[in-house]
Amino acid sequence: MVRSGEREIRLYWPTLLVAVFLLAVAETSFSSRAAQFRASVVKIDITPDKPQWLLGYGPRQSTGTHDRLYHRIVAMDDGKTQFFLVSTDICLYSPSVYDDVMSALEAETGIKPLQVWWTVTHTHSAPEVGPPGLGAAFMGERYHHDHNTEYTAWVKKRLIEGIKEAQAKLEAARLGVGWGMAMANINRRALDLEGPAFLGLNPDGPADRQIGLIRLEKADGKLLALIANYAMHGTVLGPQNLLISGDAPGIVADYVEQKLGAPMLYINGAAGNLAPIYSVYPNFESGHLSQFRVLLGDKIIAGNDLIGGATSDVRFSLGEQIVETPRKANMGWAPDLEKYVRENNAGEAVIRLPLRFLRINNNVAIWAAPLELFCEIAMRARELSPFPYTFYFGYCNGWLGYMPTKAEFPHGGYEPSVSPYTPRVEDDVLRTVVSYWQGSGR
C-alpha cells in the first residue's frame, strides 16, 4: 500500500528519462521464510602513531591525538546473502581507494563489492587516506604534498582484516528498527541581501533532524551493535585544530558505546548543507564538543530504548544502479576516476554515479551514494518512499562531490561552485531512487 506520496511516485515512474544501467542485483526470496539470521560487529583501531596530513580544510599536519579513530564493521547474513557495513573515522576517500580494497578483498575471500558499503563519518580532523581524487580538481592548493602511502596501505589492510574477522564472528541475532530526533545540526547555507550564499548558519533553512536506527541484538536480546544514521558535518573543530579526532561523530559514538556496552556505527546522512550547531571552532573546549554527547548521544540512546519487535526472521536484498547525469562544463576530473565518467552517444560528458540499495524485509529501504547530498533530496526520497523506514547513507564507497538541489544552484556559494554536477542531477537521482523502490515491491 502506497502512502501519501502515491501520486508523486506515479508521476516519476512514467517520466523516467535518466539513463540508468542495472549493474547487479542480488535478490533474496521474499516469499519464503529466511534461514537463521546472523550478525556480528568488529571495532578496529586505525589511529596513526606518526604525524599525518589532515583532510578537511587547507593542508595541515597533525601534532598529536585527542581521541582514537576506528573502522567499525557490522556483518549480516540472512542465510543467502552476506552484507558488510563499515563506518570509518576519516573525512573522505576517493572511489578508486574503494575499488582497490574491494579487488583485494574479493581475491582473498570471494566477497563481492556489492556486499560491502564503506562509509566515513566525515570528521575533518583525521588523516588523508589515498590520493585526493576529485578534490584535487577544484581544490588543488590543498594537495601540493603526496599522500601517505604507508598509512593508506595500513588502513586498507586493517579494513580487510576487520571484514574477515566480522565474517568469522557471525552469530545468531535479531534486528529491530526505529527513529530518533536530535537538534544537533543546522543548515549552513547562510544568505544575505546581496551576493551568493556563504558558509555560515541559516536557522531558517532546511535541516533533517531525524535519526535512523537499526538495532542488532544477540539471540538472548542483549545489544550486539547499534547503527545510527544522522546528517551532520564533522566540523565542530576548525582548521586551527591539529589534534587527530573523530570530531562530533566520534565523540558521540564513543559515548553511546560506553552507555550501552556495545559498538555503535555512526553513519552520516545527507549532510552536504548541514553543519553541527557549534561549527569550525579552534579547539575542543570552545567548540563545546563534549556537549554533543547530550545533543545527539542521549537522543540516540533514547531512540534505541524505544525500539521493540526485534526479529530473527530477516531477509534482505542488495542492488546497484548507475545514474548517468551531465557533468558540469569546464570541470576538471581526477585521473584515478576515469571509470566514473564517459561521453554519451550525443557527445555529452556524463558522470556515472553509482547508487546502492539495501532492502530489509518489507519495511526498511536504505540507499547510499558517494556524495555530499543536500538534505532536502534525502528527505524528499524518504517522503516518496513506499517503505515506513527509509534511510540515506552518505559518503559511501568514496566521494564524488557535492550534490545540491536544483533550487540552490542559482544561489551559488561554495557547494554549487565546486559541484561537478548540473541542476538536472536532483531529478536524475530522485527518479532513479523512487523508481527503484517502487519496482522492488513490498
Task: Tell me what each language-model feature is.
Residues 300:
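Glycan-recognition surfaces in beta-rich domains, encompassing non-catalytic CBMs
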Residues 1-3, 27, 205, 387:
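Exposed boundary/loop context
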Residues 34-119, 123-263, 269-271, 277-280, ...:
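Conserved beta-alpha junction segments in alpha/beta enzyme cores
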Residues 26, 31-36:
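Boundary at the C-terminal end of the N-terminal hydrophobic targeting segment
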Residues 1-12:
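N-terminal secretory signal peptides that target proteins for export/translocation
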Residues 296:
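Anionic-ligand-binding alpha/beta catalytic cores of soluble enzymes and soluble regulatory domains
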Residues 14-27:
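Bacterial N-terminal signal peptides
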